[in-house]
Every structure is written in structure tokens, then in C-alpha cells.
A protein has these predicted regions:
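Non-catalytic signal-transmission and effector/linker regions of two-component phosphorelay proteins
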Residues: 1-7
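Short acidic/polar segment at the start of the alpha1 helix of CheY-like receiver
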Residues: 12-16
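Charged docking surfaces used in two-component/phosphorelay signaling
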Residues: 17-25
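Acidic, metal-coordinating helix/loop segments flanking the phosphotransfer/catalytic sites
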Residues: 32-51
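Conserved phosphotransfer cores of two-component systems
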Residues: 44-47, 69-76
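The short loop immediately C-terminal to the conserved phospho-acceptor aspartate in CheY-like receiver
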Residues: 56-57
Length: 81
């Protein structure tokens, strides 16, 4: 079995790096998105995402909009920050 894949979504690159570094040390495969639109695109391209860590306040598409879009198609766990 491969590593669990986690999508980290935050418009602040420092926060993304902090979370990514922590998760990679725990042996997770980490994908990053800098805004909501990018997050939705990545989610639908990568079918095996096990968890999404999602910032609420972002440009283009906020976290609530991203959550609604993904929830319409998937029950993947989402942690809102």
C-alpha cells in the first residue's frame, strides 16, 4: 500500500510549507494548492486524496466554496482552518 495523499490548501506559502514539512516527516504524500480554484482542479485530477486541509479565507474561491464543490462529488475528510 502506498502513502496516504493529503491536499494542503492555503494562500499563504509559509503556512503551506509548515504543514507540508510536518506531514512529509510523518510519511504522507503531500499535494499543495495556493487558492481554491487550484485545489478543486487538483482534487479532480488526483482521485486518491485521503484528506484535505483547507484554509477558509482565500482569494478566487474561499474554503467554504471549495468544500461545497468537493462535497457535491466526494465524502473525503476535510479539515477547515
Amino acid at each position: 500500500m502506498g502513502k496516504l495523499k493529503i491536499l494542503v490548501v492555503d494562500d499563504e506559502s509559509r503556512m503551506r510549507k509548515l504543514v507540508k514539512d510536518f506531514l512529509m516527516k510523518k510519511d504522507f504524500d503531500v499535494l499543495e494548492a495556493g487558492d481554491g480554484e487550484q485545489a478543486v482542479d487538483i482534487f479532480f485530477e488526483e482521485k486518491d486524496i485521503a484528506l484535505i486541509i483547507l484554509d477558509v479565507m482565500m482569494p478566487k474561491m474561499d474554503g467554504w466554496q471549495v468544500c461545497r464543490e468537493i462535497r457535491a462529488h466526494s465524502r473525503v475528510p476535510i479539515i477547515m482552518l
